[in-house]
Structures are given as C-alpha cells and as structure tokens.
Curated annotation (Swiss-Prot):
Miscellaneous information on this protein: The mutant strains shown below are all feedback-resistant (fbr) strains exhibiting enhanced arginine biosynthesis.
EC number(s) recorded for this UniProt protein: 2.3.1.1
Alphabetized InterPro entries for the sequence: AceGlu_kinase-like_sf, Acyl_CoA_acyltransferase, Asp/Glu/Uridylate_kinase, GNAT_dom, NAGS_kin, NH2A_AcTrfase
Pathway membership: Amino-acid biosynthesis; L-arginine biosynthesis; N(2)-acetyl-L-ornithine from L-glutamate: step 1/4
Stored HAMAP family: N_acetyl_glu_synth
Gene3D superfamilies: 3.40.630.30, Acetylglutamate kinase-like (3.40.1160.10)
The keyword Hydrolase belongs to this UniProt entry's keyword annotation: no
Keywords associated with the record: Acyltransferase, Amino-acid biosynthesis, Arginine biosynthesis, Cytoplasm, Transferase
Catalytic activity: L-glutamate + acetyl-CoA = N-acetyl-L-glutamate + CoA + H(+)
Species name: Escherichia coli (strain K12)
NCBIfam families tied to this protein: N-Ac-Glu-synth, PRK05279.1
Protein name: Amino-acid acetyltransferase
Family listed: Belongs to the acetyltransferase family. ArgA subfamily.
SUBUNIT field: Homohexamer.
Length: 443
C-alpha cells in the first residue's frame, strides 16, 4: 500500500520551524473574552493553547466573563448598572460575578488539563495555576457614582508568576482580584492582560475577538498597525458609539502594551479554527498585529543578504525574466541592492546602477516573492530606488524589461530608443534578449 504524500503538511512544517525555535522560552499573555469561551470553537482554542505549552512557550491566560455575568444577572432579575461604560458592581452583582468567574475558572482549568488528550502528546500533564497574583483597589466614586466593587490593579506579584512559569505551569487569571483588606473586586480582563504583559515583559499579547482583525475600507485585513494608527481606530469607533466591542477593548490595551515595551500584540478571531497557530507560525499570520517596529523592513543589502537574494531571483532567472547573476557578481555589487525583508526572509529586491556622467541610473534586478506580488512591494522599491537616485544627483531612471512593460508605464516610465542609454550600457545591450527600454524623469 502506497501512503499518500502530504506536501502541504511538509511545506507548512518547514515554514513553521523557525517560529517554533523563536517562540520557545518566550512569555505570551493570551486574552480570552467571555464571548470566545461561549463559542463552539473554544475547545479547539484550548487545544491549541495546550500545543503552545508543549512547545516550551510560557503562557499566561486571562479570561473575561462579560456575557456570563450578564446572563447570571438576568437569571436573577438583577439589572446591570453602568457609568461611563464601566460596570457598577454592587454587593449583589459581585456575588453573581464571583459565581460566573469561578465557574469559568474551573471549566477552563479542566479543559486545559485535558487539552492534549487525543493527540500524540496524550499523557503529558499540564499544570494550571491560579492565585492571588494581583492585588486590586476600588475605582472609587466618579461624578457622584460609587463604583462599589468595580476595581483596578494596585500591584502585580510578577516574581510569583515567573516562578510558576519557570516550573512549567500555565498561569490562569480571571476578572476577580482581592485587595489588601481582603475585599473582592471586579476588574476588566483587558486591564489584567495589558498590565500582566507589561509587568512580565511579555513577548506578545494575543487577543481573541469576533473579527479576524482590523479591516480597511475595502474590507481587507490590515496586517500591521503602529500604536498611533491603532489609537486612531479606537477613537473612530468611539465616535460611532462603540466603546465595548472586543476589538476596541483589545486595541486600547494593545496600544498601551506596545508603548510600554511589549513587542507585538495580535488580534485574531475566536471563530476561525486554528487562528492562533496560523498567526504565530506563519510569516504573514492571519490577523492584525500592533507593533512598535514593523516585521517588514526596507533597507540597503549587506553581504549577509546574498543567500536570500539568490533564493529570490533564481526562479526568475530560470524563467528568463531576469538576467542571470553569479554569487561572485552579487558579492561585488551588493552595495547597489535594496531589499525588503519580513521576519528575516527577503521578499523583494532591486538594484540601482548609477551612470554619474550622464546623470542617469538603471533600476535592475527587480524581484518580488510570489506571495507578495499582489501587494505594493514593487512600488515601495521603486520609490526607494528613485529617492536614492535623486540623492545621488541623477535626473533620470531607466529599466530594461521583457515582461513588466505596462507596470512601469503605469508608474510614469515611457518607452525610449536604445540610443538614449548611457554609452557603456548601450555597448552591453543584448540584442537577442530584445529588452524594452523605459525611462522616467525623476523631477
């Protein structure tokens, strides 16, 4: 019997290995809203969290309970009270909050404990720890409204949490915390997750919401946002009256976390099976990241980038789209190359060859990874090469191309005669290849 070859599985595993190594030993804070816990996909999310733990990732899981609390209040005919979009937790509400949060804690602990069942790791034990790692204090009175048992964080015992993580446990935190006087307070899961990520110096904070991420005007997922961009999104939603959706709540925390040193915050959907794994173990992820520094950088190439450039351009050379370059030639000309790199993978490149006497430059060896050709990476490279040419005192830019004629024409290049090429370039023109010459004024 011939076994079926799973090519996609092999390729996926190969691509995920660098991320497995990168994430091992790092601390991630995962925020699960009550909506995520209610969803039918929650069992899969818990299994994926168990998988992350088995890969050596240090995990703090923070759960919320808004819908469960509201359901408990409704069942007991107790009207919920809010002031400035914050729940007012009176004594009766507090008892119902503690019931809902306690039930969820036991349920999540049980699910995490058995998350590796029916997997090759069955039998491996996951230790889930909860405790009084957070000390709370009351919100107090605002505009004459007493928030009663609604609270905020006073301090976090990060050393105790680190000891639990060092021992291999998953730390589970709910929305109820106690004060130094022994009173219980209702906190928001967003504040808990955000402050934990900051205090623990977490590598990532991950939030599960109903949407896959932040979308643009065309409905496409925005893969990255800087904190100021995320803040603008929050303010735009608040102007529409959206103060408490999962996305808005998470973005508020993500902005604060990133500005306080958390490298990346990820917004993904609890409705998408495997979203957590796709986000963490693929180059482009599946949701939206809030980052202080982009995972994608455009910069001048160095000698260490030659391998990545060769891997990118070889298929195009084999198809006859690019002129073949040897490693030795690349080594000599590497200072002329600009690359776009994403998570240490070269996804686009281009070179600028100046002809100072004629005040003209050639943009050559333009290549974009197949996964990114529908995006704007080519335009980004063109803008950067044009800027470099202008800084070098050049007034025109030309390209030789056999396949991308229309692309360059749409961006201001016009076909010209070979005679307009610099003399030294004209002498090297390959008449068998019959490349078209297009030129643009740099202005």
């Amino acid at each position: 019997m011939v076994k079926e070859r799973k090519t996609e599985l092999v390729e996926g595993f190969r691509h995920s290995v660098p991320y497995i190594n990168t994430h091992r030993g790092k601390t991630f804070v995962i925020m699960l809203g009550g909506e995520a816990i209610e969803h039918e996909n929650f069992s899969s999310i818990v299994n994926d969290i168990g998988l992350l733990h088995s890969l050596g990732i240090r995990l703090v899981v923070v759960y919320g309970a808004r819908p469960q609390i509201d359901a408990n209040l409704a069942a007991h005919h107790h009207e919920p009270l809010y002031h400035k979009n914050i729940r007012v937790t009176d004594a009766k509400t507090l008892e119902l909050v503690k019931q809902a949060a306690g039930t969820l804690q036991l349920d999540i602990t049980a699910r995490l404990s058995m998350s590796l069942n029916n997997t090759p790791l069955q039998g491996a034990h996951i230790n889930v720890v909860s405790g009084n790692f957070i000390i709370a204090q009351p919100l107090g009175v605002d505009d004459g409204v007493d928030y009663c048992h609604s609270g905020r964080i006073r301090r976090i015992d990060e050393d105790a949490i680190h000891r639990q993580l060092d021992s291999g446990a998953i730390v589970l935190m709910g929305p109820v915390a106690v004060s130094v006087t022994g009173e219980s307070f209702n906190l928001t899961s967003e504040e808990i997750a955000t402050q934990l990520a900051i205090k623990l110096k977490a590598e990532k904070m991950i939030g599960f919401c109903s949407s896959q991420g932040v979308t643009n005007d065309d409905g496409d997922i925005v893969s990255e946002l800087f904190p100021n961009e995320a803040q603008a999104r929050v303010e735009a939603q608040e102007e529409k009256g959206d103060y408490n959706s999962g996305t808005v709540r998470f973005l508020r925390g993500a902005v604060k976390a990133c500005r306080s040193g958390v490298r990346r915050c990820h917004l993904i959907s609890y409705q998408e099976d495997g979203a957590l794994l796709q986000e963490l173990f693929s180059r482009d992820g599946i949701g939206t990241q809030i980052v202080m520094e982009s995972a994608e950088q455009i910069r001048r190439a160095t000698i260490n980038d030659i391998g990545g450039i060769l891997e990118l351009i070889r298929p195009l050379e084999q198809q006859g789209i690019l002129v073949r370059r040897s490693r030795e030639q690349l080594e000599m000309e590497i200072d002329k190359f600009t690359i776009i790199q994403r998570d240490n993978t070269t996804i686009a490149c281009a070179a600028l060859y100046p002809f100072p006497e004629e005040k003209i430059g050639e943009m050559a060896c333009v290549a974009v990874h197949p996964d990114y050709r529908s995006s704007s990476r080519g335009e980004v490279l063109l803008e950067r090469i044009a800027a470099q040419a202008k800084q070098s005192g050049l007034s025109k830019l030309f390209v030789l191309t056999t396949r991308s004629i229309h692309w360059f024409q749409e961006r201001g290049f016009t076909p010209v005669d070979i005679d307009l090429l610099p003399e030294s370039k004209k002498q090297l023109y390959n008449y068998q290849r019959k490349s078209k010459v297009l030129m643009a004024d740099l202005g």
